[in-house]
Amino acid sequence: MKWKHVPFLVMISLLSLSPNHLFLAQLIPDPEDVERGNDHGTPIPTSDNDDNSLGYTGSRLRQEDFPPRIVEHPSDLIVSKGEPATLNCKAEGRPTPTIEWYKGGERVETDKDDPRSHRMLLPSGSLFFLRIVHGRKSRPDEGVYVCVARNYLGEAVSHNASLEVAILRDDFRQNPSDVMVAVGEPAVMECQPPRGHPEPTISWKKDGSPLDDKDERITIRGGKLMITYTRKSDAGKYVCVGTNMVGERESEVAELTVLERPSFVKRPSNLAVTVDDSAEFKCEARGDPVPTVRWRKDDGELPKSRYEIRDDHTLKIRKVTAGDMGSYTCVAENMVGKAEASATLTVQEPPHFVVKPRDQVVALGRTVTFQCEATGNPQPAIFWRREGSQNLLFSYQPPQSSSRFSVSQTGDLTITNVQRSDVGYYICQTLNVAGSIITKAYLEVTDVIADRPPPVIRQGPVNQTVAVDGTFVLSCVATGSPVPTILWRKDGVLVSTQDSRIKQLENGVLQIRYAKLGDTGRYTCIASTPSGEATWSAYIEVQEFGVPVQPPRPTDPNLIPSAPSKPEVTDVSRNTVTLSWQPNLNSGATPTSYIIEAFSHASGSSWQTVAENVKTETSAIKGLKPNAIYLFLVRAANAYGISDPSQISDPVKTQDVLPTSQGVDHKQVQRELGNAVLHLHNPTVLSSSSIEVHWTVDQQSQYIQGYKILYRPSGANHGESDWLVFEVRTPAKNSVVIPDLRKGVNYEIKARPFFNEFQGADSEIKFAKTLEEAPSAPPQGVTVSKNDGNGTAILVSWQPPPEDTQNGMVQEYKVWCLGNETRYHINKTVDGSTFSVVIPFLVPGIRYSVEVAASTGAGSGVKSEPQFIQLDAHGNPVSPEDQVSLAQQISDVVKQPAFIAGIGAACWIILMVFSIWLYRHRKKRNGLTSTYAGIRKVPSFTFTPTVTYQRGGEAVSSGGRPGLLNISEPAAQPWLADTWPNTGNNHNDCSISCCTAGNGNSDSNLTTYSRPADCIANYNNQLDNKQTNLMLPESTVYGDVDLSNKINEMKTFNSPNLKDGRFVNPSGQPTPYATTQLIQSNLSNNMNNGSGDSGEKHWKPLGQQKQEVAPVQYNIVEQNKLNKDYRANDTVPPTIPYNQSYDQNTGGSYNSSDRGSSTSGSQGHKKGARTPKVPKQGGMNWADLLPPPPAHPPPHSNSEEYNISVDESYDQEMPCPVPPARMYLQQDELEEEEDERGPTPPVRGAASSPAAVSYSHQSTATLTPSPQEELQPMLQDCPEETGHMQHQPDRRRQPVSPPPPPRPISPPHTYGYISGPLVSDMDTDAPEEEEDEADMEVAKMQTRRLLLRGLEQTPASSVGDLESSVTGSMINGWGSASEEDNISSGRSSVSSSDGSFFTDADFAQAVAAAAEYAGLKVARRQMQDAAGRRHFHASQCPRPTSPVSTDSNMSAAVMQKTRPAKKLKHQPGHLRRETYTDDLPPPPVPPPAIKSPTAQSKTQLEVRPVVVPKLPSMDARTDRSSDRKGSSYKGREVLDGRQVVDMRTNPGDPREAQEQQNDGKGRGNKAAKRDLPPAKTHLIQEDILPYCRPTFPTSNNPRDPSSSSSMSSRGSGSRQREQANVGRRNIAEMQVLGGYERGEDNNEELEETES
C-alpha cells in the first residue's frame, strides 16, 4: 500500500520546485489513498521547512501534519433582504487548511475572486454577506451552503447550512372585520397574517396598545381573538399584527362594538292617586345604543289626549279617572334586546253620594227613614250623627233594642216612633282614603191630621158627545181618609139633583137622561175630605137630531196602562224637587207619557197638575215654593186613557233661603268654621310657574263660603316674606292651580276656609318647588383683565344674574374664551358660587372674545356680551383700536364666501360681456367679408336699391333694403345685400334730392341704385376668369327716382295719399317714379301745386285710358296703402316709391323690384343693423357702347317726369320724397285701411292683405329674382301715369343732358345690376376714401362689366335654359321680407345654380348683347293722347339699352325672332310662361312676399310673362288655386299672354282690353278662359318666377290693378314675347311717345326689328 504512493511522491518531488504545482498536487490527491491513510492513522511525513506550505520537502511528510477538520459547522440562517449575514465555518488541520464555500455544488465567488462581490471570505473561514440580494427573478444568495476545508492531506466538508431570505408581505390574507356584540356575549375576531417566511406570528393591539392576553377572558389561537365574556370596556379598535424577522405588518382596523342591553336605572313604581289628579310613572333606562322607551297599558290603550311622555320618558296622565286604573308597562328596547318594567295605577275616588237624605215630615209616632248612599274607591264608610251630638251611628254596629235609631248596611238611617224631640238635622258622612263628604237632612214632626193628604180621584169623567134625549153617565171614583165626599158642578155651578133627568148614584156617578141642548158644558167632580179636595173635569156636548153621534167606546182595562210606582224624591232645592219612578210593565199597556200631580198646604187644598206629557221616568218639578212640604203622585197615560194614580210620595220639604240672607249668628258661624278641618295634599308642580293644590274638608259646613290658598317663597334667601293669597269662592271645589309663580323657587303653601269676614283654621303647610329654566339674563359686570401672576393669563370676573331672572339655582358658570380659530378656543366651568376665573396660556397676538353664561339644572342661560382682549408679545393687553390690523380686516373680508362669490360672478359677467363683444365683432367682420365675397359665392341677381337722404344735415341711408348709394357722402354707405340698415322712423325734412338738373348735374344726395348687373359682375369673380371689360354707362337713363318711396317701400302698402286707390300728393297730383337710377327729365311743374283732385274717387274707363299716354316707369311694390300711411301730414311733399309707378286708373302703384319691396315692413327686421362701408370703384365709360340720350324729349308735358332741372332740384314745390314719419304699419292697421279702401291691386310677391303686404327686413342676399319679372310691370304703369299727367299742361320736359364723364362702377355689394347714374352722378365724384377703396376692385370689375349684358338674358342662357337659370341662380338672390317670405329666403338659399346662365356661351351672348344694345333700332309706335295728339309715351321713347337700366325692354333680344306663342294651362304653383329671356337684364326686384317652402328645381319653375290686366270673365281658378296654396302673393296671372282688364278699373269695356291682348299676342283667346274676378289673388308659394320683360301698355290697354307687382313677374309667355319685342327699342330713335296698337302691327314691327 505504501508503494502505491510512490508514483505520487515522485510526482510531488518533481513538482517541488513550483509551489503552484505543489498546490495543484495537493488538490489532486487520490481520495481513496488519503482516506485510507487517515483511517490507518499513518502520518504523512512533512518537511520541517515552515515555508513549505504543504509540509513536506522533497518526498518526506512531516509527522505533525494532519488533514483538515471542521471545528465549527455553519448553521442555517434566515436573513432579511438587504441585511448582512454571516455563515460561520472553522476548520483546523496542519498545515492550516484553506476554506472554500459551495452553494448547490457550485463554488461561491467571493471578494477574493471578484473585488466587487458582496460576499467576503473572512480569515476565519466564515462567509460574510455585505447584504443579502434577493429579488423576484434573481435570488443569488439563497440556497444551501457547505464549507470545504482543504490541505494537502485532504479536505473536510461541513454540514449543509441553508441561507433563506426572510419574507413578509404587506397584505393580510384575512383582515379582521368589525364585530358588534352585547355585553356578556362572546366576541370573535379572525385574522390571517400575510404570507411570509418564516411564518409570521400574530398578536393583537387594542386602541394602539398591545392587547393584554393575560386576561382569562381573552384567548388568541390560530389568528383568532376570542373574548368569552365581553364587557363594555372591551369596546375599541383592534388591529391584528403579523410579525417575523422582517418586521411587523398591521391589518386594517376592526372595531369591536359592545352593545348594552337595555336596563332600567329607574323603574316605575305603583301609584295611587285620586280622581282628577295627575299620575306620573318614571322610567329611566340605559343601554348602548340608547334604547327607545315606550309605554303601554296592559289591559287597554293609554287614555287619549290625557297622557304625555316627557323627554325623560316619564309617563304623565292628567285628570285621572276610575277607568285609568290598571297596569302600565315601560318598554325599553334597542337593537340588542328589550326590557320591561310595570307598575300599577290605583285611582282613589273620593266618595260621592248616590242618594242623599232629604228632609222629612212625619207625624208623631210614625217611622221615618233617611236614605244615604255613597260610592268611591275604595268603598267609603257611611255613618250618621245628629247635629250637635257626638254620638256616631255606623252601619256595622249591632242594633240596640232600646234604641230607636239604626243604620242599615246600605247606610240608611231609620227612626222609629218619632217623637217631637227628634226634630232637627241629621248628618250623613261618608269617608275613604281619598276624602270624606257630609250631607244632612231635616226631620219635622207634625200632627196626625196635618199629615193626611187630600183625597185622590182614581177615575174621573171623560169627554162625551150625546144626542138630544140621550143619556150620558159621568163616573168619579175617589179615595181618601176619611172617604171623600163627591160633588158635581157644571160650568162652576153645583149640579142640582132635583131635576128628574139628573141622578147621582151612591158611588158618586152622575147620570143625566133625556139630554138637552142646555146640558152641554163642563162637568167637574169634586172629592173632598177635611185635609183637602180633588177635582176632575170633563166636557159634555149635546147635539140635535140628525147629527150622527158616535157612542163612547167601551174601555178595555188591558189597553189602559197600570199605575206607576211610588215616586221617589232624588233631589230637593229651594224651588225644585226631582222625582223618579218606574212604570208597571207587569200589567196593562205600555204608557206613552206621564202626568205628575202635587199637593202642598202652602199652595192650596187640592191636587194640582204640575207636569204633563212627561216622556221619561224622571222629572224635575220647578216653580215650587221654598220651605214648603209637597206630596207628589204620578199617572201613566196612553191613547186609550189614564191609569190609576201611583202611591203618594213621601212628604218633601223644599229648602229654605240661604242663611246669609236671613242674618247669621256670628258665634254659630265661627263655631262651624272652626269645626271644618282642611287636609292639604302634597302640591303638584305643573310647570315652572304653576302649582296645583288639592285639599279635603273633614267637617263640611254650610257656612263655608270658600277657601283661601296662602303661599310664599321659602328658603334662606327669601326669609319670612308675606303670604300671598289666592281665593277660591266655590265651596264645592277642592283643588286649584296657583299661577304666575317664580321659576325654580321653593314655596310653602297652606289653605284656610272663610265665610264673609270670618275665617277658619289653617291647614298644614306643604312645600313645592317650581321647575327650573335656563337663566333668562346673562351674568352682570363681566370684566376681562390681565392676570398679574402669569404673563399669558387673563382674569375674568362677573356678578350673578338678577335674582328674578335666574330661574332656579345657579349651579355653575360657563366661560368661553374664543380665539379667531378653533385651536385657540379655551373653555372653563366653575361652580355657582364662584364669580371669577383665571384663563392661562393665551397666545399672544390672537384676539380673544370672552363670554360668560350662568347655568341651572335646566341648562345654560343667556351669554354675556363678548369682551375682547388681545395680548402682545410681552403679555400686555393691546388697545382696542390696535387689535385688528388692516391686513387682518382685509384677510377677513377676502375669506368671506360672499366676497369670493362676488369676485366669481364679476369675472363671469366680464367674460360674458367680452364673449358677446367678440361675437358681435366677429359677426360684423364676417358680415363685411360676406358683403364683398359672399355675393360672389351665391349666384343671385338681386336688385338692392337703397335710398340715401339727409337728416339733420348729414347723409343717412334709408331704412330700406340695400342698394342705394350716395357716392358723394362717405357716411351714407350703401346697404349691403346681407345686412339691414337701421330704419329711421321720422324723416320730416325734405332733404332728398330726387330731381336732376337739366345740365346733367345732380345734388350730392342724389340716390344711386345698385342693380343686379353689379351682382352679376361680382359673382363672376368666382367664375373661370371670364372677365370682360364692362364699361359703366354714363347716361341714357330717363326715369325719375323718387327717393322717399324707397322708404315707403320699407313700410306696408298703406299710404295716406292713396285716395280711392290712387296715389296723389296733397294737391291731388300723382307723383312719378322709376325703378332704376334714371336720368330724370326736368319736372317743371310743381308737384305740390298740381291740379289733381285728391278727393277724386273713380276708375277711369278704358276709352279714356286709350287716349292717355302711359309713361314708362318701373314699379316695385304696390304702395297705394303704404304711401297713404306716411303721408298723413298734408304738408309733407308727396312721394311714391322710387321703383313704383302710379296707376292712374287703379290708383295703385306697382312694384317691380323685390329688392325694394322686400325691404319694407317691420316683421323680421333686425333693427340697428349697420351697413358696412363698401369701396367705390371706378367704372368704365359706356358712352362708346351706348347711344346718347335723345336731344329733344317727346313733346308732352308728362316728360317732365323724367327730367328735373337743377333749379327745381330743391324747389319746395317739387315733389321731393320725404322719409316716412312712420315706417311701418301694423298688421291691424293695414287690414283696416284695406277694408276702407276696398279692393286694392295686389302686389307681386306680396299678399293684398296687410299681413302679406307688410314686409319684414330679412336678408335677401340669397334670393334671386327672375330676370324679366321685374321690368315689364314697371313699364306697364305708364298708361295711368300718362293719363293723369294730361291734367298738368304747364309741366314741361327738358331734354336730357349729354352723357357725363365716366363714373365709378357700382360697388360690389349690388346684385346683378350696375347702378345707372343720374345726371348729377355724371359730375359728382365719389369721395377719395371710397375711390381708394374702389381702386382695389377696379381691375377685376372692368373685366367683368362687359359680361353683364351677356349674363342678363341671352338666347342661350335665358331661352335655352330659362327655367334652370331662373331657378338656379337668379331666384337665389330674390328676397321677400314679409312674414310669409321667410320660406322664400330658405328656398333661395338652397336653390341650385346648376341652371345658371353663367356659361361660356352666355358670356359670348352677353358681349353680343352689349353690342346689340349699342346700335339697336326699334320701330316706334305713336299713340294719341286725350287731345288727339300722337306722341310717344315716356316709357316707350327710344333710348339706349344701357346695362345700367333695369328696364328689361331695352334688351339685346329685340333683334331676335319672336317665338310663336304657346297656350299654357294655368296650374297653381306651376305657372308656365314662355318668353324671350335671352336679351333682358335681370330685373331689379323679386316678388316681395313670395313664400315658397321649397326651392323649385329648374324643371319645376317656368318662365312666366308679365301679368297684364285680365278680362272680368277670366276663369278665377288661378285665384282659388293660389289661395288654396296659402300664398301671401296676390295677383292675377296672364295665361298665354292674354291681358286682363280690371273690372274695377274699367268695368265697362272689357272687350277692348281683350282685343288689345289678343292683338298684342297675335292670337286671340277666348275671354271666358281668362276672365278673373278683380279680387286679389295669392300666388302659390312655389311660384318664384324668373324675369319677364316689362311691356309698354298703351292707354287702350291699362294695367289691371291686380297686376301691380304680379305683372312684373307673372304673365303668359306670349304676352311677354309681344311686349319684349315691342319694348326693345333704341331710345335714341324714340322721339315721341309711342304706344302699342292692336292688330298684327305688333308682330310686323317686331319682325322688322328682328330683321
Curated annotation (Swiss-Prot):
Explain what the record says happens when changing V273A: In NORS; uncertain significance
Q: Does the keyword Membrane apply?
A: yes
- Residue spans of biased composition, Pro residues class: 1186-1196, 1296-1307, 1480-1490
**Residues bearing PTM Phosphothreonine:** T948, T1240
The protein's PTM annotation reads: Ubiquitinated. May be deubiquitinated by USP33.
Give the record's GO CC terms: axon; cell surface; cilium; cytoplasm; cytosol; endoplasmic reticulum-Golgi intermediate compartment membrane; plasma membrane
Subcellular localization(s) per the UniProt record: Cell membrane; Cell projection, Axon; Endoplasmic reticulum-Golgi intermediate compartment membrane
Consequence recorded when altering S689P: In NORS; uncertain significance
Q: Which Gene3D superfamilies match?
A: Immunoglobulins (2.60.40.10)
Q: Point out the glycosylated residues in this chain.
A: N160, N463, N790, N820, N827
Q: Where does the source fall among the domains of life?
A: Eukaryota
Q: Where is the composition biased (Basic residues)?
A: 1459-1470
Q: Which InterPro entries match?
A: FN3_dom, FN3_sf, Ig-like_dom, Ig-like_dom_sf, Ig-like_fold, Ig_I-set, Ig_sub, Ig_sub2
Let me know which tissues express this protein, per UniProt: Widely expressed, with exception of kidney.
Show the GO MF annotations: axon guidance receptor activity; identical protein binding; LRR domain binding
Q: Which residues carry this modification: Phosphoserine?
A: S940, S1055, S1297
Point to the regions of Basic and acidic residues compositional bias. Answer: 1281-1293, 1516-1541, 1549-1573
Residue span, Fibronectin type-III domain? 563-657, 676-773, 778-874
- Compositional bias per record (Polar residues), positions renumbered to this chain: 44-56, 1137-1146, 1255-1269, 1438-1451, 1592-1601
Q: Where is this region: Disordered?
A: 33-57, 1124-1202, 1224-1337, 1352-1397, 1420-1651
> What does the subunit comment say?
Homodimer. Dimerization is mediated by the extracellular domain and is independent of SLIT liganding. Interacts with SLIT1. Interacts with SLIT2. Interacts with FLRT3. Interacts with MYO9B (via Rho-GAP domain).
Q: Which disease is it linked to?
A: Neurooculorenal syndrome: An autosomal recessive syndrome characterized by variable clinical features including congenital renal anomalies, neurodevelopmental defects, intellectual impairment, cardiac defects, and ocular anomalies. Some affected individuals present in utero with renal agenesis and structural brain abnormalities incompatible with life. Nystagmus 8, congenital, autosomal recessive: A form of nystagmus, a condition defined as conjugated, spontaneous and involuntary ocular oscillations that appear at birth or during the first three months of life. Other associated features may include mildly decreased visual acuity, strabismus, astigmatism, and occasionally head nodding. NYS8 patients manifest bilateral horizontal nystagmus in the absence of other neurologic signs or symptoms. Brain imaging is normal.
* Other comment: Maps within a region of overlapping homozygous deletions characterized in both small cell lung cancer cell lines (SCLC) and in a breast cancer cell line. The promoter region of ROBO1 shows complete hypermethylation of CpG sites in the BT-20 breast tumor cell lines, some primary invasive breast carcinomasa and some primary clear cell renal cell carcinomas (CC-RCC).
What role does this protein play? Answer: Receptor for SLIT1 and SLIT2 that mediates cellular responses to molecular guidance cues in cellular migration, including axonal navigation at the ventral midline of the neural tube and projection of axons to different regions during neuronal development. Interaction with the intracellular domain of FLRT3 mediates axon attraction towards cells expressing NTN1. In axon growth cones, the silencing of the attractive effect of NTN1 by SLIT2 may require the formation of a ROBO1-DCC complex.
Query: What is the protein name for this chain?
Result: Roundabout homolog 1
Taxonomic lineage of the native organism: Eukaryota, Metazoa, Chordata, Craniata, Vertebrata
Point out the gene that encodes the protein.
ROBO1
